[in-house]
Amino acid sequence: MPNTPSPLALTQGLIRCPSVTPAEGGALSLLADLLGAAGFSVERPVFSEPGTPDVENLYARIGTAGPCLLLAGHTDVVPPGDLAAWRHDPFGGVVEEGEVHGRGAVDMKGGIACLAAAILAFLAERGPDFGGSIAFLITGDEEGPAVNGTVKLLAWARQKGERFDHCILAEPTNPDRLGDMIKIGRRGSLTAALTVHGVQGHVAYPHRAENPIPGLIRLAGALLAAPLDAGTAHFDASNLEFTTVDVGNPASNVIPAEARAVFNIRFNDLWTPATLEAELRRRLDAAAGNAVRYTLAVQPTNAVAFLTQPDPFVDLVTAAIEAETGRRPALSTTGGTSDARFIKDACPVIEFGLVGQTMHQIDERAALADLDRLTAIFRRVLDAYFPGDAALQKRA
């Protein structure tokens, strides 16, 4: 079998590309060269949106037959922050004490490197006629606004007639150890601003003013008085958290004209953004009556709750993880949002990658042993998926 690059070498190569969102930084070029040499057709569409930076993306595919396994991720990273606080250059890919250091080592250049290493080894052994197709969908706009990335790349692929049967998104899903957790869904996210309107005045003459602060407290209490729900089989209860409260008033002898609070709700699959907003307004109207004047501004959101039902594909990935780590992963929907919220409209999607303890932190790093094990897990998935269990092939 020809030599194929190691997951460490690929991780280091990607880390050394300074792809702070939305910069491409050479990361997509590295992958394009690698995949092109392995026989993939590679395209690099650039998407635009007024008020946001143009973003370059990558789509690569090998094979035309079904089933098609989609492998997804992002090469953009968050800024490194204070460079002096890092033990090593955040774009150096330095190895120390069994770990590779650098921005994106965990989130998620290491995961992409493991996918690529597994696929290259798979193709080197099996050749291009492996009984299906493999597609790579990589964006440079996940850590940023996420408007010129995966969502548009999927629409672009759909217009080209591309179809996918299942997807693995290599996000760092494991809390503590490799093999802890597969994400089979994500909670939705809704942010809103609640403003209570009053009348500004002197504190010594409250009868000439209308203090909005008691009204804000009253309405906030109404939102928090009862749980939104009790959770579902695969989701925790929906949760509302106030994140800012402000009256815009530096003077201690002035009653403010308005009081404003912002809150975020992470919600489960019992709700949609529309039904959740309706429930919020019902509670607020009941509490406000004719005594409190308020406005509620809900931010548009594309982060809806979704669930990939456990099925033979989830079982296949679970078995591969258990075979390599000895751990049976939990099937979870916890955590924040990811690009899986877009992919779920194209095909069933699960997320599995490295241990996420240091993602977005100073001295972000990944264990070399985990890179090897994750690559072995992905290789097991490929071997089982092609030709795969007959139950999986029904969608092809």
UniProtKB/Swiss-Prot annotation:
GO terms for molecular function: acetylornithine deacetylase activity; cobalt ion binding; succinyl-diaminopimelate desuccinylase activity; zinc ion binding. It catalyses: N-succinyl-(2S,6S)-2,6-diaminopimelate + H2O = (2S,6S)-2,6-diaminopimelate + succinate. Zn(2+) 2 binds at D107, E143, H360. The active site is at D76, E142. InterPro entries: ArgE/DapE_CS (IPR001261), Bact_exopeptidase_dim_dom (IPR036264), DapE_proteobac (IPR005941), Peptidase_M20 (IPR002933), Peptidase_M20_dimer (IPR011650), Peptidase_M20A (IPR050072). Its EC number is 3.5.1.18. Pfam families: M20_dimer (PF07687), Peptidase_M20 (PF01546). Binds 2 Zn(2+) or Co(2+) ions per subunit. It comes from the Bacteria. It is an enzyme of class 3 (hydrolase). Gene3D superfamilies: Zn peptidases. Transmembrane segments: none annotated. Zn(2+) 1 binds at H74, D107, E171. Keywords: Amino-acid biosynthesis, Cobalt, Diaminopimelate biosynthesis, Hydrolase, Lysine biosynthesis, Metal-binding, Zinc. Disulfide bonds: none annotated. Pathway: Amino-acid biosynthesis; L-lysine biosynthesis via DAP pathway; LL-2,6-diaminopimelate from (S)-tetrahydrodipicolinate (succinylase route): step 3/3. Its cofactor is Zn(2+); Co(2+). The keyword Hydrolase applies. One of its GO terms (biological process) is diaminopimelate biosynthetic process. SUPFAM superfamilies: Bacterial exopeptidase dimerisation domain, Zn-dependent exopeptidases. Catalyzes the hydrolysis of N-succinyl-L,L-diaminopimelic acid (SDAP), forming succinate and LL-2,6-diaminopimelate (DAP), an intermediate involved in the bacterial biosynthesis of lysine and meso-diaminopimelic acid, an essential component of bacterial cell walls. HAMAP family: DapE (MF_01690). PANTHER family: ACETYLORNITHINE DEACETYLASE, N-ACETYL-L-CITRULLINE DEACETYLASE. Belongs to the peptidase M20A family. DapE subfamily. Homodimer. This is Succinyl-diaminopimelate desuccinylase.
